[in-house]
Amino acid sequence: MNDSLVIRGIEFKSRLWVGTGKYKSFEETARAIEASGTDVVTVAVRRVNIIDRSKENLLDYIDPKKYKILPNTAGCYTVEDALRYARLAREAGVSDMVKLEVIGDEKTLFPDVCGLLKATEILAKEGFIVFPYTNDDPITAKRLVDAGAAAVMPLGAPIGSGLGIRNPYNIKIILETVNIPVIVDAGVGTASDVSIAMELGCDAVLVNTAIAGAKDPIMMAEALKHACIAGRLAYRAGRIPKKLYASASSPIEGMLT
């Protein structure tokens, strides 16, 4: 059965999305992307020269026929910077999609919610397909929907922390609050974190540091691929209710007396 994710008419076959920062080399990045089974790759516009392609570039290692390139505005601390880099990526023909980041604090890398809402509204009106990186607040998520976001990307934990999904209850409330896809972004540390996000009902998970920072990034990428598939299947299958007391799994009818 086809279980692709469709956002604004764009089909995403993989629910594991992969970032491209912190790898040892472009070659390792390409191998990890391949092992992950993803078809969505995020690229920081600030760190990739999308104008001058005469020099070695990450985009030389990513086949645009095989992967959807999702430019992101990582490292932007103002609305103006975020708008500039989003527009630059589109003008260069990379994509109409943008993973929008407006960072509010250098130490925690938490988003500037006010700036994020403003930038989302502006870019959505300009025809961008906006995927804003946000906190795990359901009210903020709802306001991003109103601002024109195509999906919301709440953090599981601070970027690069590897702490996992620290507040699954808020993520669950976001899922119940918004009528657009929810993609967990940031904080994933290992395969079980991906599985938890998918079991909660999230539509996808974006991972970077958990792969790039692993002892064996290629092996971890493959592990996360399987965790994403398993978590999604478990969500669709429907887990049993949690109970305080035991319930025998073997029937008592026909027992010898």
UniProtKB/Swiss-Prot annotation:
Keyword Transferase attached: yes
Main localisation: cytoplasm
GO cellular component annotations of the record: 2-iminoacetate synthase complex; cytoplasm
Biological process (GO), any one: thiamine diphosphate biosynthetic process
Matches recorded under Pfam families: ThiG
Protein EC: 2.8.1.10
Annotated catalytic residues: K99
Binding-site positions, 1-deoxy-D-xylulose 5-phosphate: G160, A186, G187, N208, T209
SUPFAM superfamilies from the UniProt entry: ThiG-like
Pathway(s) per entry: Cofactor biosynthesis; thiamine diphosphate biosynthesis
Localization annotation: Cytoplasm
UniProt xrefs under InterPro entries: Aldolase_TIM, Thiazole_synthase_ThiG, ThiG
Entry keyword set: Cytoplasm, Schiff base, Thiamine biosynthesis, Transferase
Reactions catalysed according to its record: [ThiS sulfur-carrier protein]-C-terminal-Gly-aminoethanethioate + 2-iminoacetate + 1-deoxy-D-xylulose 5-phosphate = [ThiS sulfur-carrier protein]-C-terminal Gly-Gly + 2-[(2R,5Z)-2-carboxy-4-methylthiazol-5(2H)-ylidene]ethyl phosphate + 2 H2O + H(+)
Summary of subunit composition and partner proteins: Homotetramer. Forms heterodimers with either ThiH or ThiS.
Family: Belongs to the ThiG family.
Function: Catalyzes the rearrangement of 1-deoxy-D-xylulose 5-phosphate (DXP) to produce the thiazole phosphate moiety of thiamine. Sulfur is provided by the thiocarboxylate moiety of the carrier protein ThiS. In vitro, sulfur can be provided by H(2)S.
Protein name: Thiazole synthase
Organism annotation: Thermodesulfovibrio yellowstonii (strain ATCC 51303 / DSM 11347 / YP87)
Organism phylogeny: Bacteria, Pseudomonadati, Nitrospirota, Thermodesulfovibrionia, Thermodesulfovibrionales
